[in-house]
Amino acid sequence: MPIKILSPQLANQIAAGEVVERPASVVKELVENSLDAGANKIQIDIENGGANLIRIRDNGCGIPKEELSLALARHATSKIADLDDLEAILSLGFRGEALASISSVSRLTLTSRTEEQTEAWQVYAQGRDMETTIKPASHPVGTTVEVANLFFNTPARRKFLRTDKTEFAHIDEVIRRIALTKFNTAFTLTHNGKIIRQYRPAEAINQQLKRVAAICGDDFVKNALRIDWKHDDLHLSGWVATPNFSRTQNDLSYCYINGRMVRDKVISHAIRQAYAQYLPTDAYPAFVLFIDLNPHDVDVNVHPTKHEVRFHQQRLIHDFIYEGISYALNNQEQLNWHTDQSAVENHEENTVREPQPNYSIRPNRAAAGQNSFAPKYYEKPQQNQPHFSNTPVLPNHVSTGYRDYRSDAPSKTEQRLYAELLRTLPPTAQKDISDTAQQNISDTAKIISTEIIECSSHLRTLSLIENRALLLQQNQDFFLLSLEKLQRLQWQLALQQIQIEQQPLLIPIVFRLTEAQFQAWQQYSDNFKKIGFEFIENQAQLRLTLNKVPNVLRTQNLQKCLMAMLTRDENSSPFLTALCAQLECKTFDALADALNLLSDTERLLTQTNRTAFTQLLKPVNWQPLLDEI
């Protein structure tokens, strides 16, 4: 078969295979066009799940008569003009493919009128060459797009459509997702002439909460934590649910980049990591998050559906999102959910905020000549917004290189090490201490202190008990080892090393102290520096800036920990013991993770500190139970 240029209709139908997956895809593209046109009132009429009719009516700026024929042409758009615009996209659409692709697989009619025109005009395309026909029509200022008989000329695609109920459910979800990010726009959704959804404009915060409650449910709002987190021109806002409102399926996860619905692995990993210590692996967090950043720092031209994005600084975005959510979860103050005016005051009081230094917000480059799509997050923040004196929690992952998508399964090397750790000693090397097994617990504890811990790997690990302790065996003796106490011992041993590996922070943490706290800091500053912390001190402003932390503590909430250290009773316990007592211990769901902790601690043991490990072993006396059998 010779090489030839495809007809416009066939080329558009091929493109439609990516853009138009189902009726919900059509609704998404057309509603986004309405929003780009500046509409604040959009009506969506659906018949038979969208297979028979999809009608989108808006009150936007409209399309001039002379541009109507281009509106249905492929690669024709008013939203970008050159490569610079493509690298700073602020509009929802920009590819110029949606209308051409939709019109190639349906009977599409577009009616529009601008404010300058005295009459409206209607355009539609038909035939193999997609020739357009324009005629006068009656229509107010704005645009109406009717898509009838979707996939009428591609039977193979049409037969894959699901039931009307299923297809409409997908359309409903698209409108819900868009309504969550466009609070100033009114949406009306009808199906077969019946109003299904109606979202009024939401200007005030209590009105926005009502819309969130209508979409996500009252229970979500009652358990929601407000986030308003900023660093330079990064801005994270929205709501995250407390861990007790976890979901069994990932059905309440809404994330937006510059007002655009996205699915991104970096963002998902940061959110999961922030919830890791609160949720089991089979539970999902609930959230509505808006991430606003300079459009030059994100590439949305990844896929025709524009659901995927790429960040130029993935690590920065990951750690920034983790910080904001972690701080909200660690300082849980739920919204006081009311529908009256007091909801505004309660909402503002319970907003989680980072203290705002005078960051200079860099303006975005205008897209297509004029920045008509610039969202409101680049406006100067209001002066009456409250500010907290607290500072962000330390990022959970600030080391170079991601381990985001590494499998949880142990590697072959780890499996070999686990097997060696679990092996008991040869019979000739085992000490006969069976005589001590019949003595009481106190006598046994005295004997094991000199015999067992000569090498802790002589102990055989039998089981993980309730994710809290390890059951160990040596010959006929059994012991319980608390994993929480083992973690704290590991931290102490690691911080007592001669050379402590430091981890620089991507985003330094600022502490604003009282005079009493600053005096305590001056007393403990040498201790902090000795174990790997690096601060910049500003005595005049009673401020500390944390730049480096011990690598072993990089996953900890050091903001909370260090503030607690500055308010503690100095005579209560030694500095290092008190510091480790403030650290949060992780939970162990797998035996392999607990064995890793035991192995890491063993490597830090020396002849002088083995006694500390010995004291953690609690003998288990099975004799009373055996006597009852």
Curated annotation (Swiss-Prot):
GO cellular component, as recorded: mismatch repair complex
GO molecular function: ATP binding; ATP hydrolysis activity; ATP-dependent DNA damage sensor activity; mismatched DNA binding
InterPro entries linked: DNA_mismatch_repair_CS (IPR014762), DNA_mismatch_repair_MutL (IPR020667), DNA_mismatch_S5_2-like (IPR013507), HATPase_C_sf (IPR036890), MutL/Mlh/PMS (IPR002099), MutL/Mlh/Pms-like (IPR038973), MutL_C (IPR014790), MutL_C_dimsub (IPR042120)
Disulfide bridge map: none
Example of a GO biological process term: mismatch repair
One Pfam family hit: DNA_mis_repair
PANTHER family: DNA MISMATCH REPAIR PROTEIN MLH, PMS, MUTL, DNA MISMATCH REPAIR PROTEIN MLH1
Function comment: This protein is involved in the repair of mismatches in DNA. It is required for dam-dependent methyl-directed DNA mismatch repair. May act as a 'molecular matchmaker', a protein that promotes the formation of a stable complex between two or more DNA-binding proteins in an ATP-dependent manner without itself being part of a final effector complex.
Family named by the database record: Belongs to the DNA mismatch repair MutL/HexB family.
Name under which the protein is recorded: DNA mismatch repair protein MutL
Organism taxonomic ancestry: Bacteria, Pseudomonadati, Pseudomonadota, Gammaproteobacteria, Pasteurellales
